[in-house]
Amino acid sequence: DFDTAVHSLIKEYLTDHQRIIFNGNGYSDEWVAEAEKRGLPNIKSMVEAIPALTTEKAVDLFGKFGVFTKAELESRAEIKYENYAKAINIEAKAMIDIAAKQIIPAVVKYTKELADTVLAVKEAGADASVQAEMLADISGLLTETKAALKKLEAVTEEAAGKEEGKVQSEFYHFSVVPAMEGLRTPVDELEMIVDKEVWPMPSYGDL
């Protein structure tokens, strides 16, 4: 009977290989712990995954079946490194441009409006503490944004001078990407409190 045979085969496979099945969240810390327990590598990024292409085990495997030679694998790894570096470079420069030419000028303009509002409310003899607090918060985040922008500009420029390939792509991953995240943090906070009419681009809510 075909169905019986299939069920029997499935049962056999499940019994033999149950230990490799993980039904939890593969993106959670639970999987990180489980992978370590099983002796599996926890590769967190593309840059850290590329070297797997040129390990002795990979070279032997692809060579054994006539898929790729060692030189071909090394060439593919090099291309992946270069593509990654180019992609992050484009993203970093776009981020710098948006922050410098759109976000910071818009926030500067808004802080002036807030400052004028604080003065007007005080002159009217009313409590301007809320407006003053908003102004202080936004000014603080604006300072953080400018500092983060300078850092991103510096590391992006430094990355351009690195040796192309593995060295450069690793620098982009371990230095430029964190600097990008460092710029995004205060900008995200600003987006939550700056007047929507002033913000120069669609918000997460709009999207």
Predicted regions and their residues:
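C-terminal amphipathic alpha-helical interaction region
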Residues: 12-207
